A protein has these predicted regions:
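Short beta-strand to alpha-helix junction loop
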Residues: 58-69, 93-102, 139-158, 168, ...
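Glycine-rich FAD pyrophosphate-binding loop
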Residues: 24-46
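Active-site substrate-recognition segment that forms the wall
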Residues: 22, 51, 82-86, 193-199, ...
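C-terminal lid/capping helical subdomain adjacent to the catalytic/cofactor pocket in oxidative enzymes
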Residues: 2, 26, 45, 325-378
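Helical element adjacent to the flavin cofactor pocket in flavoenzyme catalytic cores
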Residues: 139-199, 356
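Dinucleotide-binding Rossmann-like beta1-alpha1 core, especially the glycine-rich loop
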Residues: 49-125, 135, 256
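Glycine-rich phosphate/pyrophosphate-binding beta-alpha loops
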Residues: 56, 144-146, 251-254, 342-355
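N-terminal Rossmann-like FAD-binding beta1-loop-alpha1 element of flavoenzymes
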Residues: 5-32
Length: 378
């Protein structure tokens, strides 16, 4: 017989933990089911660790709204919970005249999205702020920052557990089924179990589609396609030549190889983008020459041999090569017909920045579902 649990959050990445925290703090009984033996082992720990301002995303999109709201909430949260972070700022640069129009579009979109403090920089200001950067124009985003993503997840988990949530590691959801009075999840691992949940949040990153397909009663047509995109990061040996993050104008279907700086002062370049057909974190060192070429467009002082292989990360894409990047997909009963179920698809960047706002959004959807079930909403 299945054990009854009010709410299960599947996936203990940064978004899943934020959702679990939010639900537990609202008084719900929450269990977090994580397939791996630790939390946050995939996209949540294999990224740039950037707090994004909300510059690039289309007007009115979930990415735009949740990134801006999430950033403001995240800075407050970090200050209140002593999560290491630094509002370091970012300079977006046009490397030549052909990129000026793109730079202008970024600035216009960011202004529409409500990003504060943006400022076009004169050539002299650019030289003073970042003397090692070569460009023809740029603007400053002072709201952009960097963060200790592991520390953030620890804080979210601590909040959730202090409000009664439980984290079950090495507990993969292997199948499930929709019943009239809830959703039954079959959980594997060393001690398999069945749990019946009134609410389920599927926040499993690039596994979200597989989890959804494993639950009988979720319409297959509601599940978007799965695509994997790997990104490589190289680190820079020696002292940091930059004081801020440096992002070139994108020339392809991602933001390009940019400069990030971690809280220890280490400079990282990346990510690039390569489409793969399965999850494989191996580092492809043959991409080194392309990195040197891309970086020297805005940092001509990069010396041969200065780049060292860093790490890779895989983004949970719901679009393929040559297709426009879609919005976050956050589905509830209106999309798939299952009461109490929220599926999160394609929660890549700016997912970390947006995590608190995503959690609020999911909680609101579940509150509506709960009210409908109780008959208070027609």
């Amino acid at each position: 017989m299945a054990e009854r649990i009010e709410c299960a959050v599947i996936g203990a990445g940064v978004v899943g933990l934020a959702v679990a925290r939010r639900l537990a703090m609202s008084g719900r009984e929450v269990v977090v089911l994580e397939a791996e033996e630790a939390f946050g082992t995939h996209a949540s720990s294999r990224n740039s660790e950037v707090i994004h301002a909300g510059i690039y995303y289309p007007t009115g999109s979930l990415k735009a709204r949740l990134c801006v709201a999430g950033r403001l909430a995240l800075y407050r949260y970090c200050a209140e919970h002593d999560v290491r972070h630094h509002r370091i700022g970012k300079v977006i640069v046009a490397c030549d005249e052909t990129e000026l129009a793109g730079l202008g579009k970024y600035l216009e979109q960011a202004t529409i999205n409500g990003v504060e403090g943006l400022r076009m920089l004169t050539t002299r200001e650019l030289e003073e702020l970042e003397p090692e950067v070569r460009c023809v124009a740029g603007f400053l985003s002072p709201a952009t920052g960097i963060i200790d993503s592991h520390g953030l997840m620890l804080a979210y988990l601590g909040d959730a557990e202090s409000h009664g949530a439980a984290l079950a590691l090495a507990s993969p959801v292997v199948s499930g089924r929709v019943e009239d009075d809830g959703i039954v999840l079959e959980v594997g691992g060393a001690e398999p179990m069945s749990i019946k949940c009134g609410m389920v949040v599927n926040s499993t990153g690039f596994n979200a589609q597989a989890v959804a397909r494993s639950i009988a009663g979720i319409p297959p047509q509601s599940v978007p396609p799965t695509h994997y995109a790997i990104g490589h990061y190289y680190t820079l040996s020696g002292a940091a030549p930059f004081r801020r993050l440096i992002y070139p104008v994108a020339r392809q279907d991602w933001l390009g190889v940019h400069v990030t700086i971690d809280l220890g002062g280490r400079v990282k370049f990346g990510p690039d983008l390569a489409w793969i057909d399965r999850v494989d974190y191996r580092f492809d060192e043959s991409r080194e020459a392309a990195f040197y070429h891309a970086i020297r467009r805005y940092y001509p002082g990069l010396k041969d041999g200065a780049l060292q292989p860093g790490y890779t990360g895989i983004r949970p894409k719901i679009h393929g090569p040559g297709q426009p990047a879609p919005d976050f997909v956050i589905q509830d009963q209106r999309d798939h017909g299952v009461a109490g179920l929220v599926n999160l698809y394609g929660i890549e960047s700016p997912g970390l920045t947006s995590s608190l706002a995503v959690a609020d959004h999911v909680a609101a959807l579940l509150e509506v579902a709960s009210s409908r079930r109780e008959g208070s909403v027609p």
